[in-house]
């Protein structure tokens, strides 16, 4: 099964959060992948060149999955369906569409938004302290 990581999980890992690091170490047999939009969100959070290099080095440890045209179309449909009722954002719609397209599990703490997407396998990866 393909497994994607959302931005919030990767931010915890980058910050060295003990629960995130322990979970990542225990799940070493899993092959985690990162949707391209998540990688871009991480770069947007960088404040200087040192952070940018650190994030890029971290991202190089994962396979990044870029959306196909059909996934953009599905993201559009998700946005049209859920934007006014759940607040699902454009990045969240792309992440959901890519996850659905690959029948992947998505680990995130943003369950409120993603749970409205039918058929999406979404779970919290670990308990936050």
Residue locations for each model-derived region?
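Residues at secondary-structure transition points
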Residues: 18, 33, 37, 49-50, ...
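Short loop/helix-cap segments at secondary-structure boundaries that form the rim of catalytic
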Residues: 112-119
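Active-site neighborhoods of divalent-metal-dependent phosphate/nucleic-acid chemistry enzymes
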Residues: 64-112
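A secondary-structure boundary/capping signal
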Residues: 6-7, 38, 110
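Short, well-structured N-terminal submotif of metal-dependent ribonuclease cores
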Residues: 1-34, 44-57, 128-129
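Short beta-strand->loop
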Residues: 119-128
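A generic structural signal for short hydrophobic patches within well-formed alpha-helices
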Residues: 10-11, 39-42, 114
